[in-house]
């Protein structure tokens, strides 16, 4: 990531900086979480599309902060209520953000300790993503195709790209995700 995003902002590189992301988020945890959830769902990505490159990825200077320039919607999305957000804020007020951010900080360790990660998955697999998930932008330069995903699985049973859905797939489209999961489980003989 460091070489690809040398000249522009990339959230995973920003999260590597100990204490910086924590400080930014914890200044106003409710607003920080609200912006994060609302900017990476389908509605937020669509609202930001005029400020984003064609591959759905925000273009900011490499020294920008995470929340800089984020769209601030006036209403909650259908999948998130004020009570949901209050609960999440309370949880992070108790635990802080270091743990979740350390997941990003430990990525390089994964490659050393888990060399098998470069091998295709052998088990039957199901891949569900939102067509507007920004993660697809840096992995595939847009919405992935089945062929791009199949390279990583020996038995990709189900591939589904959910239209108008962003990063929070199961929250944004719970009925569709549940239907697809049941279809996948049925196809592999689960009862």
Q: Across the structure, where does each feature detected by a protein language model lie?
A:
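Flexible "cap/lid" subdomain of the alpha/beta-hydrolase fold that forms the substrate-access gate
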Residues: 1-157, 161
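Catalytic active-site module of serine/aspartate enzymes centered on a nucleophile-bearing elbow/loop
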Residues: 153-191
